[in-house]
Amino acid sequence: VTDRAEQKNSSVPEGIWIMRQTWNDVLFAHWPVDASNLRAMIPPVLELDTYNGQAWISMLPFMLTNLRARFLPAIPGARAFPELNLRTYVTYKGKPGIYFFSLDADHRLAVLGARTFFHLPYFYADMKAEKNGDGIDYVSKRRGDGEAAFRAAYRPISAPFTAEEDSLDYWLTERYRLYTTYRNKLYYEDIHHHPWLLQHAEAEFSVNTVAEAHDISLPDSDPLLHYAKKQDVLFWPLRQWR
């Protein structure tokens, strides 16, 4: 990841990045879902993105470290905590991105800051991510909403690879913009990182009710799984689309 937004690289957003994070032991769990049902759950201004006509929902449990805002002191106690994201795939005026239904995190101040300054649907949750051999045991239960719970054990099972452009793996993982709405206005935030170094993965889900808590039904079929050991990420300011 570049620290210099001035670098002559078309993939780097314009302007100055404002925050950096490291994502560790990331599981991508992807389920195909009915596009007509999902369309009604995203803001009308956004277009639901599909791959060969198929819509997808993804869950990403990971450990967030090295959270730091540029030009500001470190957030107390926010150097490392688990996070769990529920997302789908959208476009706006041809620009692909991500739309989050929820982001659970085990840090009250980070949740408050993300809700206030980035208008994202963060929730405070009791969470734990522990190493277990070459895998991760992951547990999450949202505070005040016992129905939004998650428990899984996952691990990589292949050599690392980078996804081929135009493949489903690439379409699901190489996304560099998020969209959100606030008071009927559309906002977006750009991020930048190196291409994902993925591994195929296996996972056992003993509890998985986060999607259900948002009235999203996941299919009974096994999800498509990817694992990534580490990713350094830069964030640009949230901007209102005008």
Regions found by a protein language model. Give the residues of each.
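Short, surface-exposed, charge-dense and proline/glycine-enriched linear segments
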Residues: 2-7, 75-87, 129-135
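A glycine-rich, hydrophobic loop/mini-helix early in the fold
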Residues: 51-57, 64-104
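Internal, well-folded beta-alpha domain core
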Residues: 26, 85-242
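Hydrophobic, proline/glycine-rich low-complexity stretches
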Residues: 1-70, 212, 216-217, 224-242
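Short, surface-exposed linear patches
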Residues: 49-53, 71, 81, 110-112, ...
